[in-house]
Amino acid sequence: MSETVYYLTLSEITQSTHVSEDTVVAIVEQGIVQPRGKRPAEWRFEPPMVATLQRACRLHRDLELDWAAVALALELIEEVQQLRQDNERLRRQLACLMELS
C-alpha cells in the first residue's frame, strides 16, 4: 500500500505562511527549501517545508540575517541537532556496555 503525498503550490505556501512570493523565491534561490519543479509556477512544496520557511523568515527578521546567512544558520542548527542525537545514541550504547561489565 502506497502513501499519499500532498504538495503545496507557491500560492498555497504563501497563503499558509503569510510570506510574500518574492521572499519564497529568495529562500528557494538560496537552497533553503527545494520544491519540485523548475519554475515558480511549477513548484510543489512538501508540507514540512512550511516549518522550514517559517523558521527561515524568523531568523531573517529577528536576527536581521541575509538569506545566505539564514541558509548557513539552518544548516548549522540541523547539524547540531544531528550531533545531539548521535551523542544520545552513543551514551545509551555506553550505558549498556557499562552494565555488561
List where the protein language model places each region.
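Arg/Lys-rich, alpha-helical DNA-contact motif
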Residues: 2-6, 11, 15, 25, ...
